[in-house]
């Protein structure tokens, strides 16, 4: 997720969470677009052990007892409903409604994912009413508000998703937060809330023993009733991996040291020739895997690496980002216009020193 003071301000945990879900990528799914949580949910409800682990079933039962036994306050009810909506005989599980059943099922599923993925949607009360046409009793769907103090609740939700991913056979969930230095563009009040978001994500990833602050700092943040009692982390080993990328900035660095163990903060050194050569090789490898119908020769990789060194020496490429852009554009020409690549390469070779 790329933090932005307007679209994805780090002071608003729901917006950060929503962007994370929208940016979600699965190692075994290569289709374009934003798959969201549906592929993970489909995998979960198809596995009885996962359903048992998350207490996915009909019936409300005693909420506190179910939470103690492993139920996730948000994911377990969502999975319980989705299992009914995704079933082959889903139409037979719908009570009397006005209008076509297929339309109801499609709308109900969309509303369910809008809610659990953090999109603007109807209230959780209206959503519970909407889903009440599905036969059986289900746990209550609680609110997911766009309130700044809710960092702990979204940390609980993210660690739950990571635990679910592990249960489904993945290694967990990796969260990459880019442009973290934009935190400094916020008002002083919003910077305080952004610190809670960073702390909640760090706590959800490594737990009480791995963070430089006490759990009590997250205890009273957001929610009502049972939401107030939710821990900042679901499970003992959720497999959540969090990375913050920040251009050095005095206040931002101080904030990182408040949220992340000092031993986990690394200063990246500038790229040297060997690093740029490795970057060229890796970008070529990723490009080839993304376009399996196009054959990339070892000669092409060697030539691209040489051209990157050439344009760097002439001052036309200065950063890893510029190098990646140059490599991808060069490979695009080679793939789409193979008859013109020679002309392009000759033009690059004749560039003057910048």
Where are these regions (language model features)?
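The catalytic "switch" region of P-loop NTPases
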Residues: 114-303
């Amino acid at each position: 997720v790329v933090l932005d003071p307007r679209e994805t301000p780090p002071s608003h945990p729901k917006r950060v969470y929503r962007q994370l879900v929208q940016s979600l990528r699965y190692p075994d799914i290569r289709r374009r677009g934003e798959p969201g949580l549906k592929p993970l949910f489909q995998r979960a409800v198809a596995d009885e052990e996962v359903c048992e682990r998350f207490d996915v079933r009909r019936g409300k039962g005693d909420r506190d007892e179910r939470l103690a036994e492993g139920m996730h306050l948000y994911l377990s009810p969502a999975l319980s409903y989705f299992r009914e909506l995704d079933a082959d005989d889903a139409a037979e599980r719908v009570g009397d409604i006005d209008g076509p059943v297929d339309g109801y099922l499609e709308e109900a599923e969309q509303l369910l994912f809008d809610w659990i993925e953090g999109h603007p949607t109807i209230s959780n009360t209206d959503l519970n009413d909407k889903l009440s046409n599905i036969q059986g009793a289900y746990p209550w769907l609680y609110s997911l508000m766009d309130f700044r103090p809710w960092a702990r609740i979204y940390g609980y939700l993210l660690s739950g998703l990571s635990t679910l991913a592990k249960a489904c056979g993945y290694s967990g969930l990796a969260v990459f937060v880019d442009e973290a230095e934009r935190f400094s563009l916020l008002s002083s009040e919003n910077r305080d809330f952004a610190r809670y978001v960073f702390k909640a994500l760090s706590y959800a990833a490594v737990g009480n023993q791995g963070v430089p602050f006490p759990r009590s700092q997250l205890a009273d943040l957001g929610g009502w009733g049972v939401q107030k009692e939710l821990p900042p982390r679901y499970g003992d080993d959720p497999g959540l991996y969090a990375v913050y990328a920040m251009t050095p900035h005095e206040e931002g660095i101080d904030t990182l040291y408040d949220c992340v163990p000092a031993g986990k903060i690394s200063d990246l050194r500038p790229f040297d020739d060997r690093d740029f050569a490795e970057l060229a090789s890796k970008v070529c490898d990723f490009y080839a895997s993304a376009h399996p119908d196009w054959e990339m020769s070892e000669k092409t990789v060697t030539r691209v690496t040489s051209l990157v060194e050439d344009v760097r020496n002439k001052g036309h490429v200065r950063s890893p980002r510029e190098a990646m852009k140059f490599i991808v554009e060069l490979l695009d020409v080679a793939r789409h216009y193979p008859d013109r690549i020679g002309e392009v390469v000759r033009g690059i070779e004749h560039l003057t020193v910048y």
